Amino acid sequence: MKRLLSWLTGLVVIAGLLIGLLVPPSVSAAEIRNVADDKLAERGDKVDLNNSSVRRFQQFPGMYPTFAGKIVLGGPYENVDDVLKLDLSERQKELFEKYRDNFVVTAPSIALNEGFDRINDGQFR
């Protein structure tokens, strides 16, 4: 009797393993998406005016930190040209026109604006 029970147990275990190998898990059927990665891919190498912190403007001489802060606090934007609706000096308008092709606007995302603090996003050198 013990021998029969051990054989049946073994068959059940082997059958379970085979079924597990043949039937893919439901997790692999639905691709897991990371919202932050999707948003970063959408903007490419450009600075997203609705989802970037002030630090992203360091690559543009004359914009960091004052003008960048004004842009960040003035959002959200519908399109890149909405920045020109801010109270800008002539110098700031010239800078914006100079770097305009480096900016993009996507919908604001909590994944990239955690804590809604885009002035000090906690990235320290």
Swiss-Prot record:
Top-rank lineage group of the source organism: Bacteria
Pfam families recorded: PsbU
Protein's cellular compartments: Cellular thylakoid membrane
Membrane spanning stretches: none
Keywords, comma-separated and alphabetical: Electron transport, Membrane, Photosynthesis, Photosystem II, Signal, Thylakoid, Transport
Leader peptide range in chain numbering: 1-29
GO cellular component: extrinsic component of membrane; photosystem II oxygen evolving complex; plasma membrane-derived thylakoid membrane
One GO biological process term: photosystem II stabilization
Bilayer topology annotation: Peripheral membrane protein
Assembly notes: PSII is composed of 1 copy each of membrane proteins PsbA, PsbB, PsbC, PsbD, PsbE, PsbF, PsbH, PsbI, PsbJ, PsbK, PsbL, PsbM, PsbT, PsbX, PsbY, PsbZ, Psb30/Ycf12, peripheral proteins PsbO, CyanoQ (PsbQ), PsbU, PsbV and a large number of cofactors. It forms dimeric complexes.
Function summary: One of the extrinsic, lumenal subunits of photosystem II (PSII). PSII is a light-driven water plastoquinone oxidoreductase, using light energy to abstract electrons from H(2)O, generating a proton gradient subsequently used for ATP formation. The extrinsic proteins stabilize the structure of photosystem II oxygen-evolving complex (OEC), the ion environment of oxygen evolution and protect the OEC against heat-induced inactivation.
Family membership noted in the UniProt record: Belongs to the PsbU family.
Protein name as annotated: Photosystem II extrinsic protein U
Organism annotation: Synechococcus sp. (strain CC9311)
